[in-house]
Amino acid sequence: ISGKIVKGDNVITLVTDFVQPQHIYDTIKDCYEFEAMRNKLWYDREINELYLLGDFGVRADKAYRPASNRSFYTDGGFTLVPARETVMDGNIAVQDYPFYTGKMTLEKTITLADGEIENRSIEFSRMGAVITKARINGKALSPLTRAPYRFDLSGLLHTGKNKIELELTNNFRNLLGPLHLGGESYSVGPASFQHDSKIFGGGLNRGWTDGYAFLEYGLFFK
């Protein structure tokens, strides 16, 4: 769709024939009465999410606010904006990357004097990614996956300019969800993605919200 997106509102329309054979509807009806019938339920056709890929940021139209278990929440909607060239430490997801999934490399060049290159480390108060890697002046360090959240910089720094690169790898949580629960869940199932499901949730999902809940990720320095 490059070259077809315009400034302002854009509408993407997909047209298809969506039908299910009669036995699917019969099984759904049986699921209301017999719990075991859920194991026989599948769909010949499914409607999946549409993912927009590209070099851009996503800015929430409403403010973010904290939620449970290191998550945060916004009422939405969202606007595409140019990708940032710089980010601040802390939660990067609220800096126009709420749905971002994959790897992000952050780099900074610092200048050190003679007495500033010894006994140095990079420490984090908590993990802000699944894996955090570091390269100091091109030298790769062992990645962080668990505590202690610390990179030892002994022997890697020199007087003058030093290039520090941090590579964050996150998971699919903020892309695949569940996005419409009021915080971060300890466990999820089919009902976590549905507002009202008599089959998988026993009725109305009381934790449902029309807003969006994400999990934080970023650089949380100690």
Feature-to-residue mapping (PLM):
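Aromatic-lined ligand-binding clefts that engage carbohydrates, nucleic acids, or primary amines
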Residues: 1, 12-14, 110-137, 164-166
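Short beta-strands within extracellular/lumenal beta-sheet-rich domains
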Residues: 1, 100-112, 149-151
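Signal that preferentially marks extracellular ectodomain short beta-strand elements
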Residues: 1-4, 25-26, 151-154
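Surface-exposed, short loops/turns at beta-strand junctions within beta-sandwich domains
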Residues: 4-8, 156-160
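An acidic-aromatic loop/edge-strand motif
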Residues: 7-103, 126, 163-222
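Residue-level preference for beta-strand/loop junctions
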Residues: 102-104, 145, 160
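Short hydrophobic beta-strand segments in globular cytosolic domains
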Residues: 141-142
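A short, polar/charged loop-to-alpha-helix boundary motif
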Residues: 145-157
